[in-house]
From Swiss-Prot:
UniProt keyword annotations, A-Z: Cytoplasm, NAD, Oxidoreductase, Pyridoxine biosynthesis
Pfam families per the UniProt record, alphabetical: 2-Hacid_dh (PF00389), 2-Hacid_dh_C (PF02826), DUF3410 (PF11890)
InterPro entries in alphabetical order: D-isomer_2_OHA_DH_cat_dom, D-isomer_DH_CS1, D-isomer_DH_NAD-bd, Erythronate-4-P_DHase, Erythronate-4-P_DHase_dimer, NAD(P)-bd_dom_sf, PdxB_dimer_sf
Name of protein: Erythronate-4-phosphate dehydrogenase
Length: 380
């Protein structure tokens, strides 16, 4: 069996080699000729899996090590009787870590005390729910907008989009959709951005295109720069809006979900799905062996510290988002070509998830807060 896999899928050869011959390829530039004789195609979000790519090939199964599927023509796969699986939720913890690392950065650089602010989350899928739950468990006043999930029921504090736009912190985790009752393409446009007050923080870590970037730039200017922006996703990736880079607080190349464990989980989930599709034993390689432990095992914190200080120090010990911002700005100063975006993703410096680290705390309040933030806790 011939397996074509994106070169940026960690452990792809380790996991899939016992199933067949694995060839690693550049997912962005993948062609029909490369997949023509393949039986299995394993991709990430940079590969558009279409009829044009697959028609006339021998591909019988497509796996995407991602939570989103907007890059997959699901209708064609169904009509062509091609099996498919993605990895929903694989990087939810990683994206939540990104959000809180960014908020910690804003606290340390601008003294934004986000714990006491009104929080709005857009999108209540696997990632949005994880982010929402962390905020809620930390005692924050948190709301969520997702009309589709709201109709399905649930205990989250669902509100209107206008209510979200009145929040102090807005974290976007919606998929990119162009059709249906609630398309998200350009959902946060000029009209919506005009409702934002000065001092609002926007974190965009879902899909590029949900925010109208031109309107965002203009609103930032109208508010005299008093709009705090953290952008991980961009409209037109891998091209990136240079004007926006210049004004945002944090700019990163679609790596919010790029924790070592999150990416490994994505590969692992697709491996499990392929084994099930082939009616093979999926436990030849254990999950324990497939997903790494963290490198930093223990951090001590003092309950005497302000809560935001304690959180920021712990979070940045594991993952400081500003390092990714600095790398992006440096590489774009060197070379403004669009391949910089993919180069940064391919050569990403690995990071661990908060849950791989044990936090040593001396009080029950601090223990509860750090546990709610996603850490493992050791009560001293």
């Amino acid at each position: 069996m011939k397996i074509i896999a994106d070169e940026n899928m960690p452990n792809a050869k380790v996991l899939f080699s016992h199933l067949g011959d694995v060839e690693l390829v550049n997912g962005r530039t993948l062609t029909h000729e490369q997949v023509r004789e393949a039986d299995v195609l394993l991709v990430r979000s940079v590969t558009k899996v279409t009829k044009e790519l697959l028609e006339g090939s021998s591909v019988r199964f497509v796996g995407s090590a991602t939570i989103g599927v907007d890059h997959i023509d699901l209708d064609y796969l169904s009509k062509a009787n091609i099996g498919f699986s993605s990895a929903p939720g694989c990087n939810a913890e990683a994206v939540a870590d990104y959000v809180f690392s960014a908020l910690s950065h804003l606290y340390l650089t601008k003294k934004i005390n986000w714990l006491s602010k009104k929080i709005g989350v857009i999108g209540y899928g696997n990632v949005g729910k994880t982010v929402y739950t962390r905020f809620a468990n930390m005692g924050c006043q948190v709301h969520v907008y997702d009309p589709i999930r709201e109709k399905e029921g649930g205990s989250a504090n669902f509100v209107s989009l206008d209510e979200i736009l009145s929040c102090d912190v807005i974290s976007l985790h919606a998929p990119l959709t162009h059709t249906g009752s609630y398309p998200t393409k350009g959902m946060i446009g000029r009209k919506e951005l005009a409702k934002l007050s000065a001092g609002v923080t926007i974190i965009s870590a879902g899909r590029g295109g949900v925010i109208d970037e031109s309107a965002l730039f203009d609103r930032h200017k109208q508010l005299n720069g008093n709009l705090h922006l953290v952008l991980d996703v961009w409209d037109g990736e891998p091209a990136i809006n240079q004007k926006l880079i210049a004004i945002v607080d944090i700019a990163t190349p679609h790596i919010a979900g790029y924790s070592k464990q999150g990416r490994e989980k994505g590969t692992w989930m697709v491996y499990q799905a392929l084994c099930q599709y082939l009616a093979l034993d999926a436990n030849v390689i254990s999950k324990h062996d497939a997903i790494s432990a963290g490198w930093l095992s223990f951090v001590n914190v003092s309950a005497e510290e302000p809560q935001e200080e304690m959180l920021a120090r712990s979070m940045h010990a594991i993952y400081d988002v500003s390092r990714d911002d600095i790398r992006l700005r440096f590489k774009y100063r060197e070379n403004k070509e669009k391949n910089v975006f993919d180069w940064l993703r391919k050569h990403y410096v690995e990071r661990d998830e908060f849950n791989t680290c044990i936090i040593g705390v001396s009080s029950s309040d601090a223990s509860n807060l750090m546990s709610a933030a996603g850490f493992s806790v050791d009560n001293k």
